[in-house]
Regions:
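A conserved hydrophobic secondary-structure block that centers on an alpha-helix together
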Residues: 1-24, 28-33, 185, 190
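Beta-propeller blade signature
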Residues: 2-6, 49-60, 105-109, 148-157, ...
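Hydrophobic beta-strand anchors of alpha/beta hydrolase catalytic cores
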Residues: 305-309, 337, 466
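The conserved beta1-alpha1 loop
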Residues: 310-312, 470
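A flexible loop/linker signature enriched in serine peptidases of the S9 family
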Residues: 15-21, 26-28, 36-52, 61, ...
Length: 532
């Protein structure tokens, strides 16, 4: 991290500088920053993230910075920041204990820390007068119980004084969840997903929060919203996209029709395709949604080369989006594309995510297999014409499709994957994911082994053609996962291919040329296998 002067357009001589490491700098004032980084031995968590945050004055060496907070050895991440909002200037320290648990502290002028005594599992936000909690678990406060997935608000100062009078701003239903929210000068805009389709709502803060219509909200695909300036304006940026429509950027003053500013270029002809949403029935009876992009003239004879993509983890939602790579490499050539919304993701809020945690991880894989079956039942494709792709946690998903459901697929692309779940917590950032998968060094291994592809591999089984891709420079998921699995399958004489880019980090590619190469590699492999 280097300090940059926006006026002179040059790096500041002898300015704040942080060597390459996980962490960051955040401004307190012009001459003071919070710094959280690798300070040397003992300063990082077991996940490789900062465990210490310091206050650093301009003109002094980093070694002279004053420690503000030091976490415990088993913590995941420590950071701090300053709220610059006029009239609400204050400092916060955040202690991330595990992936879904953190503590927030208000830092006093004397350096003292007062805990914001909200549930560790809740996502906490402070804006001007308000404390907003996004709940992952039931929360009892002020004689009421608030549901997981709810967004609740209260006066921040009153909360710190011990009062617990919350207002429910959003409560989930069976088919809706909160995708996010953004503040403007006078309003709070909620981005709600209803069966994985975005809807925007506007709230006016006060003793009695009131709803205000969002005029002219985009109605296609995936919608994003962000404040232009939450201190001085009620304008918001709006983005809208789907599988066949490039992202459009608009600006809207709340209460007025949005003005379209620009759109990304069109990279492929989508006029011959149609977007649908279907629901598959998983093993336990759960209805699992997925999106389908298919040719309008599809024959429905089970022969269409079809690519099923998924992730299913960390409460991350898979939503429609425009991709030139998918369009040119797959759709424009007549391929069918399906995007799975399996459990483990965030499509229906915390309950959808938590349904596939740890010992229940198998439900995510059962969901994905059910979608594969549904595609066949609808006569869109058949196993020999059905391919699947996923990366990172989605690479773990692919590994389980490979080892547990090999008969359902004709080809599998496994990208930057986790595969050896006995060792994952000891490799790079792996320890930070134990809240998702469990700790393999404890009795958790009894269920983790059931979704560890490296340990599920059976040399006597037939497996579909497989392509592994990874990056030597991946600093999140170690390339050893892909390397070991490749070696195991190759030694057993399986139909397997491997490509390791020597740079690119967890994204797998360092620039557009490398990204294009990786996409071309994957789609060429899939066409070769699925169009037979």
């Amino acid at each position: 991290t280097r300090e940059f002067d926006l006026t002179t357009k040059q790096f500041v001589k002898d300015g704040f500088f942080r060597a390459e490491a996980k962490g960051g700098l955040s401004w307190i004032d012009r001459d003071t920053v919070y710094v959280y980084t690798d300070f040397g031995k003992g300063s990082l968590t077991s996940s490789g993230y900062p465990n210490i945050v310091k206050e650093w004055k301009r003109g002094t060496p980093m070694s002279a910075a004053k420690t503000v907070y030091e976490g415990k050895p088993g913590d995941m991440y420590i950071a701090a920041g300053h709220d610059h909002t006029p009239g609400y200037e204050r400092d916060f320290v955040n202690r991330t204990i595990a992936f879904y648990n953190d503590e927030l502290y208000l830092r006093g002028a004397d350096g003292s820390l007062a805990k914001v005594d909200a549930p560790n599992s809740a996502q906490k936000g402070v804006h001007k007068d308000w404390l907003v909690l996004e709940l992952r678990e039931p929360y009892e406060a002020g004689g009421k119980t608030y549901k997981p997935g709810s967004l609740i608000a209260t006066d921040f100062n009153a909360f710190m004084a011990g009062k617990r009078a919350f207002t429910t701003l959003f409560e989930p239903t069976d088919n809706s969840s909160l995708a996010g929210y953004t503040w403007t000068k006078d309003y709070l805009v909620l981005n709600v997903m209803e069966d994985v389709k975005n809807r925007l709502f506007v709230l006016k803060p006060g003793k009695m929060w009131s709803k205000v219509p969002f005029v002219g909200a985009p109605t296609i695909g995936t919608v994003g919203v962000g404040a232009v300036d939450d201190e001085d304006s009620n304008a918001v940026w709006l983005t809208a996209t789907d599988f066949l429509t490039p992202t459009t950027l608009s600006i809207a003053e709340l209460g007025k029709q949005p003005d379209v500013l620009k759109s990304n270029p069109v990279f492929f002809d989508g006029s011959k395709s149609v977007i649908e949403q279907h629901f598959a029935t998983s093993k336990d009876g759960t209805k699992v949604p997925y999106f389908l992009v298919r040719p309008k003239a599809l024959a429905f004879d089970g022969t269409a080369p079809t690519l099923l993509y998924g992730y299913g983890g960390f409460e991350i939602s898979m939503t429609p989006g425009y991709s030139g790579g998918i369009g040119k490499g797959w759709l424009e050539k007549g391929g069918v594309y399906a995007l799975a919304n399996i459990r483990g993701g965030g499509e229906y809020g915390p309950r959808w995510h938590q349904a596939a945690l740890k010992a229940n991880r198998h439900k995510a894989y059962e969901d994905f297999a059910a979608i594969a079956d549904d595609l066949v039942a609808r006569k869109i494709t058949s196993p020999k014409h059905l391919g699947t792709m996923g990366g990172s946690n989605g690479g773990l998903l692919m590994g389980n499709m490979l080892t547990q459901y090999p008969e359902k697929f004709g080809a599998i692309v496994v990208q930057v994957p986790l595969l050896d779940m006995k060792r994952y917590s000891h490799l790079l950032a792996g320890a930070s994911w134990m809240a998702e998968y469990g700790d393999p060094d404890t009795s958790d291994w009894s269920f983790i082994r059931g979704f560890s592809p490296y340990h599920l591999f059976d040399a006597k089984k037939h497996y579909p053609a497989t392509l592994f891709t990874t990056s030597t420079k991946d600093d999140r998921v170690h390339p050893a996962h892909a390397r070991k699995m490749m070696a195991l399958m190759e030694a057993a004489g399986k139909d397997v291919r491997y490509y390791e880019n020597i740079e690119g980090g967890h994204g797998g590619a360092a620039n557009n040329a490398q990204s294009a190469h990786m996409n071309a590699l994957a789609y060429t492999f899939l066409w070769q296998q699925l169009a037979k």
